[in-house]
From Swiss-Prot:
One family name in Pfam for this protein: Complex1_30kDa
Record's catalysed reaction(s): a quinone + NADH + 5 H(+)(in) = a quinol + NAD(+) + 4 H(+)(out)
Main location: membrane
One GO location term (cellular component): plasma membrane
Chain segments annotated as transmembrane: none
Function: NDH-1 shuttles electrons from NADH, via FMN and iron-sulfur (Fe-S) centers, to quinones in the respiratory chain. The immediate electron acceptor for the enzyme in this species is believed to be ubiquinone. Couples the redox reaction to proton translocation (for every two electrons transferred, four hydrogen ions are translocated across the cytoplasmic membrane), and thus conserves the redox energy in a proton gradient.
Self-association state and partner proteins as the record states: NDH-1 is composed of 14 different subunits. Subunits NuoB, C, D, E, F, and G constitute the peripheral sector of the complex.
Record's subcellular location: Cell inner membrane
Organism: Methylobacterium sp. (strain 4-46)
Protein's recorded name: NADH-quinone oxidoreductase subunit C
Gene Ontology MF term list: NADH dehydrogenase (ubiquinone) activity; NADH:ubiquinone reductase (non-electrogenic) activity; quinone binding
Family (UniProt): Belongs to the complex I 30 kDa subunit family.
Enzyme Commission designation: 7.1.1.-
Keywords: Cell inner membrane, Cell membrane, Membrane, NAD, Quinone, Translocase, Transport, Ubiquinone
Length: 215
């Protein structure tokens, strides 16, 4: 712990760490109580902020010339079931002017929405939808918060740690019916339809010329 900031092992060069620490101290002073935690690791500064302040924080990071984080990289989620606020929403930004990155995190639970940041970075639209789809994290103020990757009528959120590995239904193409069918998951081998011509499963076929490759 140095001047209120955690510097983890395998950080960047001493000069670079000093620059990031200076930026961290500046942000802590400017943003005040919005910043809950700070850390430097792997050439990046990470801030944990209050969810209610995420729009103000990202706006400052974008507009402050000393920050210049104008490139929005992505949003992702993380699930820690043992915590009271089990979810992290993680924002990654890039400053081309200063050649550095920053990671901003907020923590929330299943019922508490996180403010949408579309007004700050319009590209966050589909990333927030993806995070909602895969984790069930809600975003208040989003104009079209619906699933993005999973199918119509999908139940649950597949990247939650308590989501079953097999899922709840199996989707397959039924040769007899000539259509895609949804059925409860069955683990019996008799149920599986092996594609023996697939290079990923099935037997090893002997092809003409294979004998030449034998030692």
């Amino acid at each position: 712990m140095t001047n209120g900031i955690t510097i983890l092992p395998h950080t960047e060069t001493e000069h670079g760490t000093g620059a990031l620490q200076a930026l961290s101290d500046r942000l802590a002073e400017t943003l005040g109580g919005a910043v809950v935690e700070r850390a430097i690791a792997f050439d990046e500064l990470t801030l944990v902020v209050e969810p209610s302040e995420i729009v103000r924080v990202l706006t400052h990071l974008r507009d402050d010339p000393a920050c210049g984080f104008r490139s929005f990289i992505d949003i992702c989620g993380a699930d820690y079931p043992g915590r009271e606020k089990r979810f992290d929403v993680v924002y990654h930004l890039l400053s081309l002017r200063h050649n550095r990155r920053i990671r901003v995190k907020v923590q929330t639970d299943e019922a508490t929405p996180v403010p949408s940041v579309i007004t700050v970075f319009p590209a966050a639209n589909w990333y927030e939808r993806e995070t909602y789809d895969l984790y069930g994290i809600l975003f208040s103020g989003h104009p079209d918060l619906r699933r993005l990757l999973t199918d119509y009528g999908f139940e649950g959120h597949p990247l939650r740690k308590d989501f079953p590995l097999t899922g709840f239904v199996e989707v397959r193409y039924d040769q007899d019916e000539g259509r895609v069918v949804y059925e409860p998951v069955k683990l019996s081998q008799e149920f599986r339809q092996f594609d023996f011509l697939s290079p990923w499963e099935g037997t090893d076929y002997v092809l003409p010329g294979d004998e030449k490759a034998k030692p």
